Amino acid sequence: MQINADFCLKMEKISAVYSEGRVVVPAQNEANSLYQDGYGSLLSDSRLLTLRPFEALYLTEREKISVVDEKSRERLDFQGLIWRFSDGDPNIWTRYVVYRDLRARGFVAREGPGHGVDFLVYERGSYGKRTPRYLVHALWEGTQEPLRHLGDMLTAAEDAGRILRLAVIDRRGEIVYYTLSEMNLQEPEENSF
């Protein structure tokens, strides 16, 4: 079978600019396209799309965007971005690894509201139609997490009608998701164990 070169189209990378610790997509059509796919946030005053660091890393790794440093005019690769982002967020690698996994599983993940919640995650196919179903907290295996902190995140999730998931990254980089729910411990009945 012979393939006609005229029918093979190479997707052009979307141009993005790194400026003051953030990545912005200035072209409105490209910004809207990414936004519709669940990436970034649109700045209403300028119609620019601002990508979160983990989104910029993911899109750079997937060769969807090409990032240029506004000051030096040099093209930034994945490694260059990770170095710049790690200055402002020591947990950027953890967030990126979990974000990449969620996207690979077909979920849209947005930045969490804070207080330890890393991501708001939508059910597959529900982005733009329904509210996020899950709150995800990312951590490495063996990391100590205070129970009070987990309890606060669980309360916030339940108050919002969402499910809290812990994304635990093991030493091989594999991720296991655990669902947290409230457990009521009761005293045993009189004649039971």
Regions found by a protein language model. Give the residues of each.
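Conserved phosphate-interacting/catalytic interface
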Residues: 1-99, 108, 125-193
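Beta-rich nucleic-acid/ligand-interaction surfaces
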Residues: 115-124
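Short, well-structured beta-strand/strand-turn elements
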Residues: 104-116
